[in-house]
Amino acid sequence: MLSSRRISLAAATLLIGCLALSQHARTAMAQAGEAFPACDALAAIESADFGASIAIDNPWFPLIPGTQQVLQGFANRGGGELPHTVTFTVTDRTSIVDGVETVVVLDEDVNEGVLSEIELAFFAQDGEKNVWSFGEYPEEFDAETGGFIAPNVWFAGEGEGEPAQAGVLVPGDPSRGTRWHLQGWSADIDFLDCGQVFKMGQTLGNPNCANGVCKDVMVEKERSPLARQGGIQYKYYAPGVGLVQIGAVGDQENETLKLVARADIRGTAEWDRVLAEVDRLYDNACDRGFDLLCP
C-alpha cells in the first residue's frame, strides 16, 4: 500500500507503475501480454479530502439525484450484436464505503428487452472534482438457474486478501494525453480498470444537449489489462449532461451506445420503482453477506 495521504490526480500520475497493486495483479497483467505498467496507481484516499463527496458537480459527469439517462445501441453478449439498453439513475440514497459517503446509482442493462444485469454503483467526488468509483454490487442473470447471481462484487477497502481500491472514473480537470490512471481494482474478482483522457473539445450531435449539439466533449479511453482479449472502450462525456456515447475497438462485446433520453424522474412512478429496486438490492446484498450494505 502507498501512504494513506491521498494526493491529487495530477501528482498521482507521476507515480511509477502500479505500486499499489499486488504481485497477483502484476503477474496477471504479464500473463495477459500487457507491458508493465498498465496504469498508474493512485494513492490511498483520505476521507478528509471528500468533505462534500455526494455533491457531485463535475462538469463532465454531474450526478444529480433524480436524473435518469437511457442509452441505447447494440452489444455482443455471445449471440451476435443484439439490441442493448442501459438505464442509469442517480438516486438520493448514500452509503459509506471505505470511510467516504458515496452516491448510489442504479444501473440496469437490458438485452433484447430482457434484464441481464442490475447494479448498484457507488461514486464520490473529491475536492478537485475528480469523480471516484468506490465499488459495485451487480446481480447478473444466470441462464442455468434462471435467477440472478452476484459473483463480481467489489467495494473499496474490502477484500479477503488485499483490500480493493477506489479509482478516478472522470477527472475534474482533464487534459489530453495524460497517463493511464487507475479506475478501480479488486484482487478478489480479478478486476482492474484503467482510464486515459484521449481527446478534448469534441463536438457531437445529440438531442439531449443544448440545440441538439454537445460541445466541449471529453473522450476517455478505458481498458482492462487483465482481459486477455480485451479491447478499448471510448466514452464521450458532455459538460452538464454526462455520458452521451460509448464506442469500442477490439472489444469482444463491441458495445456501442448513444444517449436517447435524459430526465428528472423525481415524483414519478418510475422514481418509486427505482427506489424499490435499490432497496431490494440492498436486502439481497445483506443476505449474501455484504455487511457494508446492511442496515
Model region roles, listed by residue range:
Residues A10-Q23:
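Bacterial N-terminal signal peptides
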Residues Q31-P295:
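Conserved functional acidic sites
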Residues L21-Q31:
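Signal peptide processing junction and immediate N-terminal pro/mature segment
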Residues M1-A11:
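Bacterial N-terminal signal peptides that target proteins for export
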